[in-house]
A protein has these predicted regions:
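Extreme N-terminal starter segment of soluble prokaryotic enzymes
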Residues: 1-3
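N-terminal strand-loop element at the rim of the active site
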Residues: 7, 11, 23-68
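Alpha-helix capping/helix-boundary segments
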Residues: 40, 95, 154-156
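Donor nucleotide-sugar binding/catalytic pocket of nucleotide-sugar-dependent glycosyltransferases
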Residues: 56, 118, 138-174
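An amphipathic, basic-hydrophobic alpha-helix
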Residues: 61-88, 97-98, 102, 132-136, ...
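Nucleotide-sugar donor phosphate/pyrophosphate-binding loop at the beta->alpha transition
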Residues: 107-117, 123-141, 157
């Protein structure tokens, strides 16, 4: 398979998990495309079947805060089309799964088969997702994902309870 992985590239658990997963999948013969604003800290300079696509956020005087989520959506769209990806695997519901949903909508006329898998890591559900400013978009992004995984049984239960995602099936590998 050809898989796009989006994660925070900085030091932290979710970036490490996403990068190690990508490396392991590449060793099994899959083609992995990391799509993020910087090379993940755990990703060596070169590995077979692994590619890095930088998201250029750009700086415009109109925007006080650069719209990373929109730039990410466009970059995901480009990489899917240019490299024939089969799925986008997002680590964190917002902004990554949100951006993937936008990219998927943009791809609908030419690539209606693209799928989005979202892995929930914790902070996106227990802190950010419960902030009233982000609650609705977090729930939306979870529900629009084609598949969901969580890093623990606790997080699986917390997501279902907190967001009331009755139609969601969340795999936690246990």
């Amino acid at each position: 398979m050809k898989i796009g992985i989006t994660c925070y590239p900085t030091y932290g658990g979710s970036g490490a998990v996403a990068t190690e997963l990508g490396i392991a999948l590449a060793r099994r013969g899959h083609e992995i495309h990391f799509i993020t604003y910087a090379q993940p800290f755990r990703l060596p300079a070169f590995l077979p079947r692994i590619y890095f696509h930088e998201v250029d956020v750009g700086r415009y005087p109109l925007f006080e805060y650069p719209p990373y989520d929109l730039a990410l959506s466009v970059r995901m769209h480009e990489v899917v089309l240019d490299h024939g990806l089969d799925l986008l695997h997002c680590h964190y519901a917002i902004p990554h799964a949100t951006s993937a949903w936008i990219a998927k909508e943009m791809l609908r006329p030419t690539r209606p088969d693209i799928r989005v898998v979202t892995t929930l890591h914790g902070t996106d559900i227990t802190i950010v997702g419960q902030d009233p400013s982000f609650r609705a978009i977090t729930k939306f992004s979870i529900e629009k994902s084609d598949a969901l995984t969580a890093v623990s049984r606790y997080l699986q239960t917390e997501t279902l309870t907190t967001f009331g995602c009755t139609a969601c099936r969340i795999d936690c590998g246990q």
